[in-house]
């Protein structure tokens, strides 16, 4: 009998930005990463006589949500990115990051380029530390 194994400790995630620097999220308090495609890969058009046409759609962009423990090194790095993005006065100055997520056990890598912070995350102040969710837009998301 064959088994498939998923091992979160074997997932490596690196976020790189030309002005902010690089953060190995897997060594800095990564909580959870969700990669979502922005569009559909196909759609159907039905003609008047009932014939179905399959439309192949080319979408490569998506969103990435990175949840990290409040107060972690990853949270510090991502807050730094948010402060940098808020302070930009010249829109031509925007620099885009790259996120690479590698599942060494599963044997695949997700690469996201043209990564920009969508908004400054909500902050919750409670008796115990929680998680902070940072949402990024990516111009291109691919999987190898």
Protein language model regions, located:
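Short, acidic/charged, Gly/Pro-enriched secondary-structure junctions
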Residues: 80-110
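Short, conserved charged micro-motifs
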Residues: 73-79
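Solvent-exposed edge beta-strands and adjacent loop segments
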Residues: 2-73, 107-135, 143
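N-terminal, charged/glycine-rich beta-strand/loop interface patches
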Residues: 49-50, 79-81
């Amino acid at each position: 009998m064959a088994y498939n194994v998923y091992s979160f400790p074997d997932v490596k995630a690196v976020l790189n930005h030309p002005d902010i620097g690089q953060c190995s999220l897997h060594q800095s308090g990564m909580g959870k990463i969700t990669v979502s495609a922005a569009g559909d890969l196909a759609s159907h058009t039905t003609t008047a006589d009932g014939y179905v046409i399959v439309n192949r759609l080319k979408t490569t962009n998506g969103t990435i949500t990175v949840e990290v423990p409040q107060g972690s090194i990853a949270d510090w790095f991502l807050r730094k990115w948010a402060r940098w993005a808020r302070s930009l006065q010249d829109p031509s100055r925007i620099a885009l990051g790259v996120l690479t997520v590698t599942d060494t056990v599963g044997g695949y890598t997700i690469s996201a380029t043209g990564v920009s912070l969508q908004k400054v995350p909500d902050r919750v102040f409670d008796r115990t530390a929680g998680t902070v969710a940072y949402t990024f837009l990516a111009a291109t998301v691919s999987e190898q």
